[in-house]
A protein has these predicted regions:
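Glycine/tyrosine- and acidic-biased, solvent-exposed loop/turn segments at the edges of beta-strands
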Residues: 1-249
Length: 249
């Protein structure tokens, strides 16, 4: 197995572990030279292939190169690249059966561009975009069967816009809205069969106005008015045929 360590976003050292022995390449030492090596499994299949080129610069973590790992069955496991000691370019990971697991891009040590994950079956699991190390735009997650599980929206890594959750049968589960990282706007939840469960409004992260909740059979369970806090609430409970007022300090 090959392990790497980072310090301040830069490649610091490599550790290759083979059975009970460990070989440690400390790049923080000032005797860095170009290195290339390959390891094999006992069955003859390639296990690790690493290139490291210092480019004549002996400063900490300034080298460039690639890491490539394989499973014992010969299928690729991991492919990574570095420029000046920082993650750079397209990185890829695979399942042992040969199906791609992840693919994402780096630019000068920061995630940048498209990010995708798959299930072992090959079905897409997650897709989204990074910009300068932060999530940007729409991010979508899928169930193993292919139906959407969630949709999220970001601006500069901060939740923004509409977020939605779905049941495996494709029916909506929850919808909410974000404004620069703060919940604001309508909030709605549904049962798996499509029956509405909860509905209300949020402003600056606080529930306001009329909130209504229903039982699974569609019968209204209660309704209440909120004024940005829990100090004053007035609830009407239909199922129990009781009306009550709640005032808390």
């Amino acid at each position: 197995q090959l392990e790497g360590r980072y310090r301040d976003g830069m490649l610091s050292n490599l550790i290759t572990v083979a059975k009970d022995e460990a070989f440690n390449e400390e790049y923080e030492q000032f005797d860095i030279i170009d290195k290339e090596w390959t390891e094999w499994f006992s069955n003859g299949e390639k296990r690790v292939e690493v290139t490291y080129k210092s480019g004549g610069d002996s400063k900490v973590g300034k080298g460039s190169g690639t890491w490539n790992l394989w499973f014992e069955n010969g299928n690729e496991k991991l492919s990574q690249s570095y420029v000046d000691g920082r993650a750079d370019g397209t990185w890829r990971e695979w399942f042992e059966n040969g199906t791609e697991k992840k693919e994402y891009n780096w630019s000068s040590g920061k995630l940048d561009g498209k990010y995708v994950e798959w299930y072992e079956s090959g079905q897409e699991k997650i897709e989204g975009e990074y910009s300068n190390g932060l999530k940007e735009g729409a991010w979508t997650e899928y169930y193993a069967t292919g139906e959407k599980k969630s949709v999220e929206s970001y601006e500069g890594g901060i939740p923004s816009g509409e977020w939605a959750l779905f049941y495996a049968n494709s029916n909506s589960k929850q919808e909410a809205n974000w404004d620069q990282g703060v919940l604001s706007g309508s909030w709605t939840e549904w049962y798996a069969d499509g029956q509405k469960r909860i509905e209300g409004e949020i402003e600056d992260g606080l529930a306001i106005g009329v909130w209504t909740e229903w039982y699974a059979d569609g019968t209204k369970s209660f309704e209440g008015t909120r004024k940005r806090s829990v100090k004053k609430e007035k609830w009407t409970i239909w199922n129990e045929k009781i009306q009550r007022s709640i005032n808390t300090l």
